[in-house]
């Protein structure tokens, strides 16, 4: 199959304009939600909290995307919404979308976000991490984990958000999709 590029948006530049400052992390992941908003996360592997890196989560409103696809001029400054994470926090993997919103796993928390003329944090659930792992002679496991945090993208069911933490030993966590409460 052949693909045709139909949309070209500099998401990082649009997010920097919305924030009013330069981003120190790259665009890491994007996903469309059920309403057609394009969610994004900045980050990278091994975002060490003590290094004070700062990621952002956000979206481009579906109305702007539709306008651009229809060949219309669009003011992205009114259509890009961002949520600046605390210093030391950023995404390290993919993101997912459900009817309830966008689910984004950072190196410290799992978020459910909704697009409501801005980024609405529905819930934020912290999880355990032992940080970056390094293997030594005689270790039974390798330290080859790519991420400081969970190291996976969230998996969604109609009622649950599933992901692994970065504890020792690693655990599979199940969160209630509506509340963010750890249920298993």
Regions found by a protein language model. Name each.
Residues 1-26, 31-184:
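Extracytoplasmic/lumenal domain signature
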């Amino acid at each position: 199959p052949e693909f045709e590029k139909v949309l070209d948006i500099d998401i990082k530049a649009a997010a920097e304009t919305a924030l009013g400052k330069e981003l120190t992390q790259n665009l890491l992941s994007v996903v469309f939600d059920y309403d057609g908003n394009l969610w994004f996360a900045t980050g990278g592997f091994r975002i060490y909290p003590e290094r004070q890196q700062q990621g952002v989560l956000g979206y481009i409103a579906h109305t702007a995307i539709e306008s651009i696809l229809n060949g219309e001029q669009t003011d992205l400054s009114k259509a890009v919404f961002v949520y600046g994470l605390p210093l030391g926090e950023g995404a390290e993997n993919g993101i997912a979308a459900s009817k309830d919103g966008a689910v984004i796993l950072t190196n410290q928390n799992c978020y459910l976000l909704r697009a409501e003329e801005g980024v609405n944090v529905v819930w934020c659930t912290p999880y355990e991490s032992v940080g970056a792992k390094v293997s030594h002679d005689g270790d039974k496991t390798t330290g080859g984990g790519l991420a400081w945090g969970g190291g996976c993208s969230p998996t969604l069911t109609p009622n649950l958000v599933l992901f692994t933490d970065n504890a020792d030993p690693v655990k599979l966590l199940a969160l209630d999709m509506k509340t963010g409460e750890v249920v298993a």
